[in-house]
Amino acid sequence: MGTNTIMQGIAGAPAGELRNMAQHVIDTSTMSAKQLSEMLWGLFSDQHKRDTILPVIVSFGFKNGIPLDADLVFDVRFLPNPFYDLKLRPMSGLDAPVRDYVYSHEQTRLFEDKLVDLLEMLLPYYQQEGKYQLVVAIGCTGGQHRSVAVAESLYHRLKEDGIAGVVQHRDIGKDALKH
């Protein structure tokens, strides 16, 4: 047994070794305190049973890269883009006018219905494989409008169906007016 402290051991270990030993790896660089709290509560609280899986819904912009921890990636660039409406451009998918625009198109509602069905079918299978969280990434061009609106709505739909999860918007506010 060595005389190093735990912190010395951590400092001396290559990051890859620590990552491989970790049961959970959480990238907090784009999380708010509330999002981190919800995720930690979901993963480690006494009320969180190990017979459940935590869906983590992440919106992102393809121009900033796919989230590295994504288990499933869905591309919503086929949906009509609010970016081209000058009134909607400075807003995000968190704003009602953008949400209303995105969801005024039938393909958005149809896509979400199919995605909810798919996730409700897949979650138990991922859980059986020992996963405690499933990162579902929803991407559009810049990560401001379509992906944010869909991720928020998906989070609320799953919650209504009794599936508690977390929603994160990785790229909201990054380069908001450029495409």
Predicted regions and their residues:
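Post-Walker A helix-loop "phosphate-sensing" segment adjacent to the P-loop in P-loop NTPases
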Residues: 155-165
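A structural preference for short, hydrophobic beta-strand core positions in alpha/beta folds
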Residues: 167-169
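Catalytic cysteine-centered active loop of the rhodanese-like fold, especially the PTP/DSP P-loop
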Residues: 133-155
